[in-house]
Design a protein with these regions (language model features):
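Extended, amphipathic, non-transmembrane alpha-helical segments
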Residues: 137-143
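Short, hydrophobic secondary-structure boundary micro-motifs
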Residues: 144-146, 181-182
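Flexible, acidic loop-helix segments that line cofactor/substrate-binding pockets
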Residues: 31-33, 145-163
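Terminal low-complexity tails and localization/encapsulation signals of metabolic enzymes
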Residues: 1-105, 112, 119, 123-135, ...
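Flexible, substrate/cofactor-facing loop regions flanked by secondary structure
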Residues: 116-119, 156
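Secondary-structure edge/capping motif, primarily at the C-terminal ends of alpha-helices
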Residues: 114-117, 150
């Protein structure tokens, strides 16, 4: 190394880089790796991010129509108007809450296709769950807007709820791999070999 390099102004060196991440500190979306991904964060203290969030509500003329989907088909349940709780004159859209008939129908289909799902390749099941998480992230602005306007949540609470939903997907898909991939070897007091196998048990209604 030359003397001129040693005596160079440290600020001059630093300013040559756009950013200098510490390789020993994982980035926010990598803090749970290699086990799983982390949900995307939002720095609402940052002016650019804050203004972007505020601008979401400058265009709120969308009209949503939401119903349950059972076996790929929208239900025919009765629609009800949904209003902004902060402005009861503002119609946000219509929602068809699942009737007892729709609930029973969904359980029937879940039971019917359970054997097929049970024998579905584990990695393919994990891909489906992670794909759902990715769709939540891809549609974050629309979902955050709905949380605020339809449920009356703050932007911060809406972000937390969305990130929690995404993290649930990533967490349980990683747990599925951990629990279902290999048997859990249980130690026996007399030296025998005991293997605990995790299996899909049944469909459930949430």
């Amino acid at each position: 190394m030359l003397i001129k390099d040693i005596i160079k102004d440290p600020l001059e060196i630093i300013n040559q880089y756009k950013e200098i991440p510490n390789p020993q500190i994982p980035l926010p979306n990598e803090i749970y790796l290699p086990q799983r991904q982390n949900a995307k964060g939002y720095d609402i203290e940052n002016e650019t991010t804050r203004l972007k969030m505020i601008n979401l509500f400058n265009n709120i003329d969308e009209n949503y129509k939401v119903s349950s989907i059972i076996n790929g088909i929208e239900t025919k349940d009765q629609f009800k108007n949904v209003y902004n709780p902060a402005n009861l004159d503002q119609l946000l859209g219509q929602v068809a809450f699942a009737s007892d008939t729709s609930i029973n129908q969904s359980l029937d289909f879940a039971s019917k296709f359970f054997p097929q799902w049970k024998n579905f390749e584990l990695n393919e099941r994990v891909k489906i769950i992670n794909k759902f998480a990715q769709l939540l992230e891809d549609n974050d602005e629309k979902l955050l807007k709905i949380c605020v306007l339809e449920a009356g949540k703050t932007i911060k609470d809406s972000i937390d709820d969305l990130r929690e939903a995404i993290d649930f997907c990533y967490y349980y898909s990683s747990e599925a791999i951990r629990l279902f991939s290999e048997p859990n070897n249980l130690k026996g007091p007399t030296g025998e070999k005991n293997n605990l196998f995790m299996k899909v048990k049944a469909s459930f209604f949430l």
